């Protein structure tokens, strides 16, 4: 496998997992709407899988945790665009900002005993086993992103002052007619429809 030393659990204001990693207490809560809507989960399903496979100490060895609010998301989109010329969507911007902060001094500050105010966005107070590699500039971060910034045009425009380009494939999809099939919220009706139409 790939020589991966660890991960950054970066999210938005729905920071249930970063809070758990930092405090050891898992507190599911109602989700809060943010610019990074795919992360708007107050009770993440992956928690149960992680808890079944690893102890909290094992998770803390492998994961740094980080969160941003909407203002931070806009700043991250803007900062990435200014520093690199790349336009990110809100979800990728959270990951980018997390890694940028971690490698630019947040991990060193944490290792030196300077703790971020836990109620403010940023790196939470947990030092993973790979923290020293970051401080020594011996770590490389890899960001994986799947969403196009064009799907979040208004948010991206607010951040960088211009609309993101729309990829040709997305333009093709946007030209397709809308197709919706009104249906009651009933599993059996849905199942019957699927069986009849597939």
Protein language model regions, located:
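PLP-dependent amino-acid enzyme catalytic core
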Residues: 1-198
